[in-house]
């Protein structure tokens, strides 16, 4: 009876080990590594420079003095003054403002002018606007 008893105990332990191995092998596998996406940096807004660079030769902007001389004779609906506006053509408002600001500050236009008013007059005559926040100092 001893061998029958030991055989059944051995069978019991063998089956226990087998079932334990089967049950523990069905554990859920961990998820594969997924790298976190890098956050995109927010672009820094560029402030309006009061002293930027003019893509045109500021000396050529002397022809814009005619616009300031003739501004009191301007008729509404008349075409813009050609020599000055053709120099500013193709420039965005900020570039045109920087160019004229440089010319006015360097006294290229030949007069002591009120900066904001002169700048606004020439730009408006050529169909451009002074950018918000732009200061010609």
Swiss-Prot record:
Primary subcellular site in the record, as a coarse category: membrane
One Pfam family from the record: Hydrophob_seed
InterPro entries in alphabetical order: Bifun_inhib/LTP/seed_sf, Bifunc_inhib/LTP/seed_store, Hydrophob_seed_dom, Plant_LTP/defense-related
CDD domains referenced in this protein's UniProt entry, alphabetically: HPS_like
Pro residues composition-biased segments: 38-48
Compartmental location: Membrane
Keywords, sorted A to Z: Membrane, Signal, Transmembrane, Transmembrane helix
Membrane topology qualifier: Single-pass membrane protein
Transmembrane feature ranges: 88-104
Signal peptide residues on this chain, from the entry's feature table: 1-25
GO cellular component, one term: membrane
Inducers of expression: By the removal of auxins.
Region (Disordered): 30-53
Function: May be connected with the initiation of embryogenesis or with the metabolic changes produced by the removal of auxins.
Protein known as: 14 kDa proline-rich protein DC2.15
Organism: Daucus carota (Wild carrot)
Lineage, uppermost ranks: Eukaryota, Viridiplantae, Streptophyta, Embryophyta, Tracheophyta
């Amino acid at each position: 009876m001893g061998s029958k008893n030991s055989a059944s105990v051995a069978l019991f332990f063998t089956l226990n080990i087998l079932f334990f191995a089967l049950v523990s092998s069905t554990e859920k596998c961990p998820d594969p590594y997924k790298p976190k996406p890098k956050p995109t940096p927010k672009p820094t807004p560029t402030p309006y420079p009061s002293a930027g660079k003019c893509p045109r030769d500021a000396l050529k902007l002397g022809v814009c003095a005619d616009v300031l001389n003739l501004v009191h004779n301007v008729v509404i609906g008349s075409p813009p003054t050609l020599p000055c506006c053709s120099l500013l053509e193709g420039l965005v408002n900020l570039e045109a403002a920087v160019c004229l600001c440089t010319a006015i500050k360097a006294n290229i236009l030949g007069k002591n002018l009120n900066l904001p008013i002169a700048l606004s007059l020439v730009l408006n005559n050529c169909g451009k606007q002074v950018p918000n926040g732009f200061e010609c100092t």
